[in-house]
Curated annotation (Swiss-Prot):
This is Proteasome subunit alpha type-1. Residues 235-249 have a biased composition (Basic and acidic residues). PANTHER family: PROTEASOME SUBUNIT ALPHA/BETA. It comes from the Eukaryota. The modification Phosphotyrosine is found at Y103. The proteasome is a multicatalytic proteinase complex which is characterized by its ability to cleave peptides with Arg, Phe, Tyr, Leu, and Glu adjacent to the leaving group at neutral or slightly basic pH. The proteasome has an ATP-dependent proteolytic activity.
Amino acid sequence: MFRNQYDSDVTVWSPQGRLHQVEYAMEAVKLGTATVGLKNKDYAVLVALCKPTSELSDTQRKIIPIDDHLGISIAGLTADARVLSRYLRSECLNYKHSYDTTYPVSRLITNLGNKMQTTTQRYDRRPYGVGLLVAGYDERGPHIYQVTPSATFFNCKANSIGSRSQSARTYLEKNLNKFLDSSKDEIIRHGIRAILGTLPTDEQGKDAGQYDITVAIVGKDQPFTILSNKDSAKHVAIAKENDNDTPRNDDDDDRPSPPEEPAAGPRDPEVLVATEQRP
């Protein structure tokens, strides 16, 4: 994106009613590797593709446990995610200390959105350059939430964020009706198939053990758990065997946009796979 006279400060509106600094922060989410969140009637699953920033570095974790009933997966600036995860942990600990129960997921995400929103209307702050997928379980069942740098959050049935995540969303849209009645293992493998669709063609032929894919699950009688590398590789192998048509779309992915003049008119939110109305 080219700079213009309306993007010098996060509090400056353009004549089209846009906040360009907030939109630039949303572009940072597309720089991170893809991550997928989906759920059935009893479990919520996060699947993240981890890649090192260089050949000399190790991979950074993309799934962060918050509480026994909650965890997040990130795409974007890891440092910003670290600040937000610390805030979420503090909120969960304080709530459990005060009420001796776990923090309701919807209320926690609302408070997180309120915290992130303040950075979009103060001149001395900048928006958080990270997107979150939140998987949680409470008395209302499993939850998948998407939280954007604009402080907007959505209750989803399934979703994907990060680089090339459109391919994963295509898979999720096509198989959405299968998720609700799927088993615990099946919902994990659906997430893995979706994340494999974000890989370039030359990387899709690797053996199952060569993928650095992290899987986490939370649900009924299941605290938030990140699966071991051995268990993740086992699920990847089975998912690849049962899927001979991994979806991908190189022409419609979520890589960072090339430099261009922002189009006139308000910018609509990114289309989600599926959302749920909050009761």
